[in-house]
Amino acid sequence: MVSFSFPEIYDVSDDVLVSDSRRSVAVEVEEKVQVINVKVLRLIEAVDEDRVGVKVMFRLCYRYRRELKITLLGCKMELWTSLKSSGKYSVQSLLQRKLNGICVSNYCIGIDMFVSNVKELINRCKWITSVQGVNPICCLYHMDEE
């Protein structure tokens, strides 16, 4: 199991820590809608070792961001793997399939569940050996509600 910490999540629009009550707000998930999208930004090959680094981005899909009144919820990180070599799209496909399997068991999704699902994905992938540069991003709607 890979040990890493997920930093506190700040609302980037006003640089304020997202409150516990706001983090726990969740909406019901539909079975046929992909909840979290994975995108592999680039592969990093270690010169001195037989391992591959993967710069990856996770994003909550638009439908659930809209329902949660979140403009953006995502996370970028660097995953170091025990893979000798791999293609960008094969790693992305593998991560997306595993993440979809995790998200299927969710009844609801919110900020806390997003973080929980990403952590579970990292821990389920035995070929991920370390995690670096975890950079969450969150931007909440700021409109006066009547």
From Swiss-Prot:
Top-rank lineage group of the source organism: Viruses
Family: Belongs to the nanovirus U1 protein family.
The name this protein goes by in its record: Protein U1
Annotated gene: DNA-U1
